[in-house]
């Protein structure tokens, strides 16, 4: 079996005042409040979402 590669993302800045599409991306990654952490599969789609809101999140 192959081991799935995971990536942990932490919301470090509030999405208040950002574009609606960026807030939707934050919700799509499973992040709620500031400092919330979500563990996701490392796929190109997830990487693209992280890149889009890189100023709001930190990869840990």
From Swiss-Prot:
Gene Ontology CC terms: cytosolic large ribosomal subunit
Single Gene Ontology BP annotation: translation
Disulphide bridges, residue numbers: none
SUPFAM superfamilies (UniProt xref): Ribosomal protein L30p/L7e
Top-level taxon: Bacteria
Keywords in alphabetical order: Ribonucleoprotein, Ribosomal protein
InterPro entries named in the record: Ribo_uL30_ferredoxin-like_sf, Ribosomal_uL30_bac-type, Ribosomal_uL30_ferredoxin-like
A Gene Ontology molecular function term of the record: structural constituent of ribosome
Family: Belongs to the universal ribosomal protein uL30 family.
Subunit structure: Part of the 50S ribosomal subunit.
HAMAP family: Ribosomal_uL30_B (MF_01371_B)
Protein name as annotated: Large ribosomal subunit protein uL30
Source species: Polaromonas naphthalenivorans (strain CJ2)
